[in-house]
């Protein structure tokens, strides 16, 4: 069965890895999609690179699937400015891709939780490199993949799931929740999590995503190009903003007294305004306005994984692409056309 799209099956790990191990032993290169300057997807190219050697505490993973996050698009373009942290003029890392799923191929000294042949997944935000046949990841970033999920499904959860879980934890039964950017990966998880807690959920995204947001549970939907979600007839108890672009005062007026606004991504100006004056405006008006400081690691995405395994939360894969098709995959996410998550796998 296809390792990207098929369900996990019982298989002898050495057999699964035989060809790659031979390749590693010979010292041949492996495929990776790399870039050396910020820009459009056109700057990406496939290159043969040396097989990475795991350092102490690291794991080498044979990649089966890597999902695309908006952070990959931002790191490709070097915009917003915070995407250049660690690499002001040139990319800090040549290969993008943090949400990986695959098979342990080798381990560095000190690794105790995994061994070759284990199926793993996680958010490798520190090292990235998931858009390749092999990548390195810290042991602490990975968890064992549930047998009930395919590699593709598992790769969709770590970053998007952690954001959605932490961004909706204040939702309660009967509360009014708004999610801006609700038609993407984090947003589609967030809608389902808030609905599971009994909230009335409004999803905001472009016109092409209205039906999709309803299909994952949104009670109301807003096309941001037609309507201003910060001037509701009934204000919200919780707002999760995945693409912040408005003023702090606009967010304040959309909240009930005692309400909460948290943003994760968006324009630099909007984020700086929230950081600089959000807490002050919030205190003066009886609201909580701030940036969501997302906690990383398996402990913070495992709750969503558990719900996906039981079927309480559904995973929505919009499309799958090969490594060679990565430019198209990134453009689909970056241009706001993906419904849920986009996944990239080996050729």
Label every PLM stretch briefly.
Residues 21-28, 297-347:
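C-terminal hydrophobic helical "lid"/dimerization subdomain
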Residues 40, 49-101:
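N-terminal glycine-rich beta->alpha transition that marks the start or flank
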Residues 76, 100-126:
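A glycine-/small-residue-rich N-terminal strand-loop-strand element
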Residues 126-139:
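A structural motif shared across PLP-dependent enzymes of the aminotransferase-like
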Residues 155-223:
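Mid-domain Rossmann-like dinucleotide-binding core that forms the NAD(H)/NADP(H) cofactor-binding site
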Residues 231-238:
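A short acidic, Gly/Pro-enriched loop at the edge of an enzyme's catalytic core
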Residues 245-313, 346-347:
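Glycine-rich phosphate-binding loop and adjacent beta-alpha segment
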């Amino acid at each position: 069965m296809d390792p990207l799209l098929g369900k996990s099956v019982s298989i002898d790990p050495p057999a699964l890895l035989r060809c790659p191990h031979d390749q590693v032993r010979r010292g041949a290169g492996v495929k990776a999609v790399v870039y050396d300057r910020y820009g459009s997807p056109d700057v990406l190219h496939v290159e043969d690179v040396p097989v990475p050697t795991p350092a102490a505490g690291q794991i080498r993973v044979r990649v089966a699937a890597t999902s695309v996050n908006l952070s990959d698009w931002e790191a490709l373009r070097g915009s917003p400015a915070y995407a250049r942290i660690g690499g002001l003029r040139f990319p800090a890392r040549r290969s993008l891709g943090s949400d990986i799923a695959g098979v342990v191929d080798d381990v560095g000294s000190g690794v105790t939780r995994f061994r070759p042949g284990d199926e793993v997944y996680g958010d490798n935000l520190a090292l990235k490199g998931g858009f390749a046949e092999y990548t390195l990841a810290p042991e602490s970033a990975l968890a064992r993949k549930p047998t009930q999920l395919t590699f593709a499904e598992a790769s969709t959860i770590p970053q998007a799931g952690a954001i959605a879980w932490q961004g909706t934890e204040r939702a309660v039964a009967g509360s009014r929740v708004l999610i801006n950017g609700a038609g993407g990966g984090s947003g589609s998880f967030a809608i389902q999590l808030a609905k599971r807690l009994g909230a009335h959920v409004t999803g905001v995204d472009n016109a092409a995503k209205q039906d999709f947001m309803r299909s994952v549970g949104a009670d109301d939907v807003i096309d941001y190009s037609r309507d201003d979600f910060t001037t509701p007839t009934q204000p919200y108890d919780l707002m999760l903003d995945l693409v912040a672009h408005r003023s702090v005062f606009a967010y304040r007026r959309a909240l009930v007294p005692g309400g909460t606004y948290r943003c994760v991504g968006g324009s630099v100006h909007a984020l700086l305004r929230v950081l600089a004056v959000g807490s002050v405006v919030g205190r003066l008006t009886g609201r909580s306005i701030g940036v969501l400081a997302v906690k990383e690691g398996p402990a913070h995405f495992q709750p969503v994984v558990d719900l996906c395994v039981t079927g309480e939360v559904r995973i929505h894969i919009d499309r799958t692409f090969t490594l060679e098709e990565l430019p198209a995959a990134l453009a689909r996410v970056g241009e706001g056309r993906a419904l849920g998550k986009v996944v990239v796998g080996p050729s």
